[in-house]
């Protein structure tokens, strides 16, 4: 059994070339949108944290890749734009050969940050987060 990854590079390293490339592109997209975010591993998946709040993450799955907003309500706010993707309440699924568009990732991150600023996801005020 492989040891748990402690960094995003460690997470990506053993993946297939196709999944590593797809998630590497998503990582760069997220970093370009929120360059001030701290990279971390949360619940075993690569994640991005602003002011102590995880606002985005991704992982490889048996059938492809997933994006996580770390909220059960963020995806619902953009439901009309996500119809082409498989999803659960808290994850968006995509094929490694079909990258998530940068504009969509930007909207997902903005929605998550707005949700945390309003305290909507837990019914309480959120820490100050960067506006983009």
Segments predicted by a language model, with ranges:
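Charge-dense, helix-prone N-terminal extensions
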Residues: 1-132
């Amino acid at each position: 059994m492989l040891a748990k990854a402690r960094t995003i590079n460690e997470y990506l390293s053993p993946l297939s070339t196709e999944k590593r490339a797809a998630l590497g592109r998503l990582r760069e997209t997220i970093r370009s949108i929120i360059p001030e975010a701290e990279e971390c591993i949360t619940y075993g998946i690569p994640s991005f944290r602003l002011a102590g709040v995880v606002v985005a993450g991704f992982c490889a799955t048996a059938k492809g890749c997933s994006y996580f907003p770390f909220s059960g309500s963020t995806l619902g706010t953009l439901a009309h734009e996500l119809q082409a993707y498989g999803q659960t309440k808290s994850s968006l699924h995509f094929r490694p050969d079909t990258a998530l568009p940068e504009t969509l990732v930007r909207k997902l991150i903005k929605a998550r940050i707005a949700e945390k600023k309003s305290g909507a996801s837990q019914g309480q005020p959120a820490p100050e987060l960067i506006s983009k």
